[in-house]
Amino acid sequence: MSGYPGYNNGGYGAPNQQYPPQPYYPPQPAYGAPPPQGGGYGYHQPPPPQQPYGYSQPPPQQYGGYNGVPPNAPQYGRPGMPSVNSNAYTNGNQNAPPPPPQGMHAFGQGAPQGYAFQYSNCTGKRKALLIGINYFGQRGQLRGCINDVKNMSSYLHENFGYQRDDMVLLTDDQQNPMSQPTKQNILRAMHWLVKDARPNDSLFFHYSGHGGQTKDLDGDEEDGYDEVIYPVDFRQVGHIVDDEMHRIMVQPLQPGVRLTAIFDSCHSGTALDLPYVYSTQGVLKEPNLAKEAGQGLLGVISSYSQGDMSGVASNLMGFFKKATTGDDAYNKTLATKTSPADVIMWSGSKDDQTSADATIAAQATGAMSWAFITAMKKNPQQSYVQLLNSIRDELATKYTQKPQLSCSHPLNTNLLFVM
């Protein structure tokens, strides 16, 4: 079904992938920068020249070909997956959160006039793309990212009906060149993930590796910086910017298609450029420039006291940039990055935070990946806001990072989280 090139001689689906035993490691540092120049995580660099990847870039388009009416789609009905009106979603638990409603819903919240979105009931076909990069032999090598992919793929298969043939795993311990998490392979796999997606399909994207920031060139970031991820070959071909990930994986989706994304990387709070970010109270966050400007000045003072003059310059630049362009950037994101599809993102840290490469139960793992699976296993019938708080509670026992929940549309965070 999957049709991902490079597997089974160009046939369908990804093979069952075997992982070598992972050694036990002591607690690891943050998913800090694999920087080609300079020190710590979150360094800023200009985007590298874009290179062709063997596929033509689609022209700019409306989201999912959206014209206000969702297309009719067959119900794939994978065996064992519940209908949205059945008690199977909640195992008969009358206290469980309500399942997602059907039909189209108006955006509001400053979105483009006339826009509507559709929740997915996640009863259609299922595809997953899982990326884990340990950066073997490189500065900033990590130890838990491949384990994250192994753990997440098993969890999806055993608990959510994702078939092995419908999952593509890109990790840098594999011999097949098509399975290496190079920039070209990652972009190709992103296109594969969303290709031919229909309403009520459930797509899953997971990235565990290095993340960072680079200067924003299109004015859609409140802090003046885009979020980026680092392929295994980033030193040769550069990083992948959040704008490009949004264009490939969010923009083509029709109303009612679910994409669940998890980023276990530094500075990943808005890594898909989804405009609706929610607090642990389930309340939509809007930029508080006075508060954020104050935090920026605190960063200046902190950097100065530590003798970090580059940090002083960076914090001052961010402070003035945010104070003058934050509202404009937020409004532009609402107007240009809103989508009628059902895109949910869980990220391991805020845009200004690092994410931990940890050792838990004697296994190297990413903290966010571990916390998501742990929280879901403890209670698989949680609302969005309950799950966000559960993930934070798991992380709070060991780490300072704070996970983020963002969405492509205004979200009723009291609904049951499904995928």
Curated annotation (Swiss-Prot):
List keywords of the entry alphabetically. Answer: Apoptosis, Hydrolase, Protease, Thiol protease, Zymogen
Q: What is this enzyme's class at the first EC digit?
A: hydrolase
Q: What's the superkingdom here? A: Eukaryota
> What name does UniProt use for this protein?
Metacaspase-1
**Species classification:** Eukaryota, Fungi, Dikarya, Ascomycota, Pezizomycotina
Residues of the region (Disordered) are: 1-109
**Pfam families attached to this UniProt entry:** Peptidase_C14
> Gene3D superfamilies under this entry?
3.40.50.12660
UniProt xrefs under InterPro entries: Caspase-like_dom_sf, Metacaspase, Pept_C14_caspase
What job does the chain carry out?
Answer: Involved in cell death (apoptosis).
Assigned protein family: Belongs to the peptidase C14B family.
Assigned EC number: 3.4.22.-
According to the UniProt record, one GO cellular component term is: cytoplasm
Polar residues composition bias: which ranges?
A: 83-95
Q: Where is the active site?
A: H210, C266
Q: Name one GO biological process term.
A: apoptotic process
